[in-house]
Amino acid sequence: MPPLDWLRRLWLLYHAGKGSFPLRMGLSPRDWQALRRRLGEVETPLDGETLTRRRLMAELNATREEERQQLGAWLAGWMQQDAGPMAQIIAEVSLAFNHLWQDLGLASRAELRLLMSDCFPQLVVMNEHNMRWKKFFYRQRCLLQQGEVICRSPSCDECWERSACFE
């Protein structure tokens, strides 16, 4: 699927209250409006509960701004040119608490792999062992760092779905 179609899919999931997106998918007001125009979409108001959840995620993500910026910049280096602002969106949602496909509101991990194949094809090739995407992102970033080798990455040991991944 072309990256623009993936952006539209995420736009629709965001407005349907799916996933763990922050407000405006973490984009600045200017970038949000640019995405809306690019997609040809009309801004539809979020229901009260969804708006509250989106605001809460934005507040939580704000406490990890430096991490989000670093992850977004790293992802942007691997992103297809016509996929912007997908790197920012993925970086924002990567700070949420579930598997990335769930936090994006996608139907399955397989659907996330399709998104990644279309928007970040080189990362899919690099992830030859099909590691969970959040863990893969942080592991790759850690390998590029010099000095301290301690990496902040999602903790599989604390995940309630651990048995589904490691049986």
Curated annotation (Swiss-Prot):
Keywords, comma-separated and alphabetical: Molybdenum, Nitrogen fixation
- Which spans of this chain does the record mark as coiled coil? none
A GO biological process this protein is involved in?
nitrogen fixation
What are this entry's molecular-function GO terms? Answer: molybdenum ion binding
InterPro entries per UniProt: NifQ
The record describes the protein's role as:
Probably involved in molybdenum processing.
Family of the protein in this entry: Belongs to the NifQ family.
Its protein name is Protein NifQ
